[in-house]
Amino acid sequence: MEQKIPELLKTVEQNFKIKILFAVEVGSRTWELNSTESDYDVRFVFYRSLEDYISVSKFEEQIDLGFDKDFNQIQREGAYIEMSGFDIFKYFKLLSSCNVTAIDWINSNIIYLGDNNKNELKTFIENNVNKPKIFIQYFCTARGCHKGYLGAKNELNVKKYLHVMQLILNAEYVLKFKKLPYSSMIKNLQELEKEIPKEIVEKINELINMKKSGHGKDITNEINVLDKYYVETFERFQNLHLDKKIREEKNMDINYLNKFMQKLIIKKEK
């Protein structure tokens, strides 16, 4: 796959007449929770020619593709290899607003294409991102996911409980260390283990073992000990009242992102 996915991405570049800035893996493989049944979730950022950007023709800001195990193109949903790409303008807008999806892409530890571009951007983000705002984004996303999952009790599974915990760990990591979390849930859990009740760590490790053995989508009843811990954690986060700290933090240097885009697109024309 380390060779095949970059080959597929090069074909995407040719078919859509785009240039991929960087491409990464997201999800369970980057969390180090993948099993033999895990699919591949590939995300990429692309840009077009200057001519395309100043054309009256409308080009899509997002490209979604799917491939089966034989690398035949199929619909994206449920595919063995799911690909989703954002145009650089869309992606940089999300990045500048501290969107956690955009942050997770730049923070991925599995890179298929454009490692130099990705690492340069990651260094910039680490030094310029509004850490309290990132914390709030992870916190609110975790709370929203937990509420949504509990609302669909007949669809509760191991993976969903781990997803909420992964977001909580990301928020806790930013709060404690004032920097971006690891993309690996395992590493974040190890770093924060002393901050978390022993019974919660044990339960999460139990779910991690289930996920890695291929039981991530197994339907489960409500796990009361985790639900209680999640709700209490959300209340603790809410009581931090970080709105003032968010305002006090410097805004991201948008000029850097603008120049980064301009350099790529204009250079491509020369």
Q: How would you label these PLM feature ranges?
A:
Residues K245-K270:
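Acidic, carboxylate-rich catalytic segments that either coordinate divalent cations
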Residues N116-E249:
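Conserved nucleotidyltransferase catalytic core and NTase-mimicking acidic/glycine-rich helix/loop elements
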Residues I74-E77, I88, N107-N109, C145-A152:
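Short acidic (Asp/Glu) patches
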Residues L95, I168-L175, L264, K268:
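Generic structural signal for hydrophobic core residues of well-folded globular domains
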Residues M1-I20, V24-E37, R43-D104:
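Metal-dependent nucleotidyltransferase catalytic core
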Residues S49-L50, S96-N99, G114-D115, N157, ...:
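Alpha-helix initiation/capping motif
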Residues S84-K131:
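Glycogenin-like
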